[in-house]
Amino acid sequence: ALRGFGVIDSIKTQIEAICNQTVSCADILTVAARDSVVALGGPSWTVPLGRRDSIDANEAEANSDLPGFNSSRSELEAAF
């Protein structure tokens, strides 16, 4: 296991106590990465927050909504 995931889990638990199912682990990792860069003297940037993923997995939706592994470049560009 990678070090530091306990810290992320702790942060997520504390945030979910205030605003459940709003902030994702991806949000926390992104903000932590940005803040680490700033702490080391690097640039800052705005991080858009808010859960945009689902709170449960749906294989049928994933198979129909996500591009396939063999999609062409034009198909990938059109999907996004």
UniProtKB/Swiss-Prot annotation:
Q: Does the keyword Cell membrane apply?
A: no
Keyword Lyase assigned: no
Q: Name one GO molecular function term.
A: metal ion binding
- What's noted on cofactor binding? Binds 2 calcium ions per subunit. Binds 1 heme b (iron(II)-protoporphyrin IX) group per subunit.
BP GO terms, sorted: hydrogen peroxide catabolic process; response to oxidative stress
Residues annotated as glycosylated are 70
Write out the entry's keywords from A to Z.
Calcium, Glycoprotein, Heme, Hydrogen peroxide, Iron, Metal-binding, Oxidoreductase, Peroxidase
The record's function comment reads: Removal of H(2)O(2), oxidation of toxic reductants, biosynthesis and degradation of lignin, suberization, auxin catabolism, response to environmental stresses such as wounding, pathogen attack and oxidative stress. These functions might be dependent on each isozyme/isoform in each plant tissue.
Protein name per UniProt: Peroxidase
